[in-house]
Amino acid sequence: TGLFASTNFGWHIIGTDKLRRPRQLSRRLCRQVYDVNTKQQHTLKNAINCSGVALHSGVKVAMCLRPAAADTGIVFHRTDLDPIVVDGVVDGVVDGTVDRGGLPAARSGIDTLVPARWDTVSDTVMSTTICNDAGVKVATIEHLMAALAGCGIDNVVVELAGPEVPIMDGSSAPFVFLIECAGLEMQQAPRRSVRVLRRVEIDEGDRRAVLLPSDGFSVSLEIEFDSAAIVEKSGFFDLHNGGFKRDICRARTFGFEREVSRLMDLGLAQG
């Protein structure tokens, strides 16, 4: 078992197959390139663990990324929730077995599985929260989801011992590191994707998104903040051939000092 830890940001990554010095591992990982446009589904080759502090709740959370069968999708499993007990008999989830195409087996009781889909998104204020029909939530999933998408991962079970994904260093880079340590495995199933056939525009307040037909995946972004600290206000990113890792994953969440008190009064930014 290998170990890599960064105490500067309070996060720890545990569980590589062989012990390597971080510098040696970094050189090896830099040679790995993933193409998000591949036609086959992918999962992780091995399970890998990490822990860190959650941004908004401030709690320390343990997380494990596990391989999953084709067509599973990205599913979060809240392992911190106790199953329902009736007359001394456990009638819930978590028995160490795996069923339903790689998902933890579930009997009756509270459903602790939360699939990461557009229709399970329940809140997007300051972070993205998903929620299942039983009311079980997982918050601040956006950096992990970006890393999974950017590295071409279609199927994974995310075991999370808490209500929120750890913030790590405020970017997607630690999650990319996790994925590369675990390795990728191609699956014998075609990737299912949404193809944009015509121009789509969405406006909401001062925000706007435009989707255009394309044979690949590229993103053009513009932001506007009343702050001299933000120099670059626009950018173009091509997500082919490792573009996410090269150009995007190290971008970190930022905030303004004037907003800290308000966020903490709302019970946010506790980490």
What are these regions (language model features)?
Residues L3-F4, I13:
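Intrinsically disordered, low-complexity regions enriched in Ser/Pro/Gly/Gln/His and often acidic
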